Amino acid sequence: MEDKNSVIVFKNVSFQYQSDASFTLKDVSFNIPKGQWTSIVGHNGSGKSTIAKLMIGIEKVKSGEIFYNNQAITDDNFEKLRKDIGIVFQNPDNQFVGSIVKYDVAFGLENHAVPYDEMHRRVSEALKQVDMLERADYEPNALSGGQKQRVAIASVLALNPSVIILDEATSMLDPDARQNLLDLVRKVKSEHNITIISITHDLSEAMEADHVIVMNKGTVYKEGTATEIFDNAEELTRIGLDLPFPIKINQMLGHQTSFLTYEGLVDQL
C-alpha cells in the first residue's frame, strides 16, 4: 500500500472487546494526513478512544489492517514503530511516573537506553519548549492540571515522535488551561511538523483541526474539513454531539453559514 500523504491508515478495521457481544469498531477505514491536525470526535461509546488504543498497540485489531508510513503494523515491527507515536491521556495524575518533573520526562528516554548526556539535553529542550524548564525540580503535587499536561507533552517530545495523540487530554482542564494547552500543541506542531491526532467529544476542539473524523456507533459517520463537517450541524446534534458555542449563537441569529469560529462570531456581531 502506497500513500505518501498519510502517516496512519486504517483499512477495514474491526474490533471487539472480549467482554462485549457487539463490535466496538465495524469495518472502519480512514487516512490520517501527514503533518496535519486531525480530530476524531464522537460521544461516549462511539469507538474513538478504541482507535487510539489500536494506534499505540494497547489493543489489537480483530480484522483489517493499520498502516504506519505505508508499512502494515504487525507484532514483529510494532515496538520499532511505537517510539514514533506519543500519547497524552485524559488524567495527568495517571501518567506522572517520576518523583519530580525532570525525572518524569527522562523516564521514556531511560527505557530507550538514551546516553546520559543526550538524555539531559533532550529533557532540558523538551521542558523549555513547553515553558516548564523553571519547574524541572518540582514535585507533581505542586503543579496544576494544565502544567502536568505540559509535562506529559514534554515527555513525548523528548522522544522525537512523528505523531502525538491527545486522548481527551483537555477534558479535565478549565477553559483557560484548555486553550493554553491547545495553543501549545499548535505551536509544537508548527515548529516540528508533527502530526496531531486529537481524540475528543468536544466539537469546539475539532474547529481548530485541519481534518475531522466523526465516529458514531463504531463507524465513520462523517469525514472532512472542519467547514465541511459543520456545514450540516443537524447531523451532529442528531447523534448526540453538542455544537460549539459560536455555531449555536450563529444559528440563533439566523445566519446562513454553519461553521463559525469565536473570532468569526465577533466579526459577525
Swiss-Prot record:
<dbReference type="InterPro" id="IPR015856">
    <property type="entry name" value="ABC_transpr_CbiO/EcfA_su"/>
</dbReference>
<comment type="similarity">
    <text>Belongs to the ABC transporter superfamily. Energy-coupling factor EcfA family.</text>
</comment>
<dbReference type="InterPro" id="IPR003593">
    <property type="entry name" value="AAA+_ATPase"/>
</dbReference>
<dbReference type="GO" id="GO:0016887">
    <property type="term" value="F:ATP hydrolysis activity"/>
</dbReference>
<dbReference type="GO" id="GO:0043190">
    <property type="term" value="C:ATP-binding cassette (ABC) transporter complex"/>
</dbReference>
<keyword id="KW-0067">ATP-binding</keyword>
<dbReference type="GO" id="GO:0005524">
    <property type="term" value="F:ATP binding"/>
</dbReference>
<keyword id="KW-1278">Translocase</keyword>
<comment type="function">
    <text>ATP-binding (A) component of a common energy-coupling factor (ECF) ABC-transporter complex. Unlike classic ABC transporters this ECF transporter provides the energy necessary to transport a number of different substrates.</text>
</comment>
<dbReference type="Pfam" id="PF00005">
    <property type="entry name" value="ABC_tran"/>
</dbReference>
<dbReference type="InterPro" id="IPR027417">
    <property type="entry name" value="P-loop_NTPase"/>
</dbReference>
<comment type="subunit">
    <text>Forms a stable energy-coupling factor (ECF) transporter complex composed of 2 membrane-embedded substrate-binding proteins (S component), 2 ATP-binding proteins (A component) and 2 transmembrane proteins (T component).</text>
</comment>
<feature type="binding site">
    <location>
        <begin position="42"/>
        <end position="49"/>
    </location>
    <ligand>
        <name>ATP</name>
    </ligand>
</feature>
<dbReference type="InterPro" id="IPR050095">
    <property type="entry name" value="ECF_ABC_transporter_ATP-bd"/>
</dbReference>
<dbReference type="InterPro" id="IPR003439">
    <property type="entry name" value="ABC_transporter-like_ATP-bd"/>
</dbReference>
<protein>
    <recommendedName>
        <fullName>Energy-coupling factor transporter ATP-binding protein EcfA1</fullName>
        <ecNumber>7.-.-.-</ecNumber>
    </recommendedName>
</protein>
<keyword id="KW-1003">Cell membrane</keyword>
<keyword id="KW-0813">Transport</keyword>
<dbReference type="InterPro" id="IPR030947">
    <property type="entry name" value="EcfA_1"/>
</dbReference>
<dbReference type="GO" id="GO:0042626">
    <property type="term" value="F:ATPase-coupled transmembrane transporter activity"/>
</dbReference>
<dbReference type="InterPro" id="IPR017871">
    <property type="entry name" value="ABC_transporter-like_CS"/>
</dbReference>
<keyword id="KW-0472">Membrane</keyword>
<keyword id="KW-0547">Nucleotide-binding</keyword>
<feature type="domain" description="ABC transporter">
    <location>
        <begin position="8"/>
        <end position="242"/>
    </location>
</feature>
